[in-house]
Amino acid sequence: MLADIIRAIILGVVEGVTEFLPVSSTGHLLLAERFFNLGEGPFWKSFAVLIQLGAILAILALYFSKLWNIARGMFSDPAAQRFVIGVLVAFLPAAVIGAASGGLIKEYLFNPWVVCFTLILGGGILLWVDQLELKPVHHEATEFPLPMYLIIGFAQCIAMFPGVSRSGATIVGAMLLGADRRAAAEFSFFLAIPTMLGAFVYDLYKSRADMTMDHGLIVAVGFAVSFITAIIVVKTFLTYVTRHGFALFAWWRVIVGTLGLIALALGR
């Protein structure tokens, strides 16, 4: 039991740290499973899905005031209505494409080789975008034009490939369309709520047979660690990227991907 709790803590930290950073939480969890045997077996695969709820609730807690004001204004405030429609429009491509091809992607592409290559490629793209002399024209995530929300939604679909990073794809898409770093990151967080919640419910339903009440304590520990870690990371991340950009995360991706390829080539 103690070993399982320690494993739950480690995976909770990995989820909480990487879910909202542009480094790919799925990619890191797959590599942790491959090289450190941290996620093997049906239960631990289901566990990785369950602790995503902790990260989702972290965003709800951090942005509760803003989200509550939007919810209250849904039937009377045109700006709130427009933002809700924008989030739904951005969510739609992932919902449709994910339902149609998610199973095939998981079957054929969820392997360490793909993760390592996409980590490196995504790191290179993130470095390139970060060094562009972009002139942001959108400074509030709640005020993007509707077509911009849709394009960001299609950018999110690229992250169905493991190692790409959902937050990385949406942040890059938003910045190329004129958002500043903070607004791009914040919209990525808002879009994560329906996207991750939908994936959570779908995967939870599919893996329901692997969960029992005996796992309650382990799941609770991982959930709590994921929640607390995500809150700390999101608050720190926004301050950091506003001042320094994304180069640190880009180089992290390149280093992890390269080390992973070396380990795989050596038969590890």
From Swiss-Prot:
The entry lists its GO molecular-function terms as:
undecaprenyl-diphosphatase activity
Q: Name one GO biological process term.
A: peptidoglycan biosynthetic process
Q: Does the keyword DNA repair apply?
A: no
> What are the alphabetically sorted keywords of the record?
Antibiotic resistance, Cell inner membrane, Cell membrane, Cell shape, Cell wall biogenesis/degradation, Hydrolase, Membrane, Peptidoglycan synthesis, Transmembrane, Transmembrane helix
Regions that span the bilayer: 47-67, 85-105, 109-129, 144-164, 184-204, 217-237, 246-266
Superkingdom to which the source organism belongs: Bacteria
**Membrane topology recorded in Swiss-Prot or TrEMBL:** Multi-pass membrane protein
As a miscellaneous remark, the entry gives:
Bacitracin is thought to be involved in the inhibition of peptidoglycan synthesis by sequestering undecaprenyl diphosphate, thereby reducing the pool of lipid carrier available.
Give the protein's recorded name.
Undecaprenyl-diphosphatase
What organism does the record attribute this protein to? Rhodopseudomonas palustris (strain BisA53)
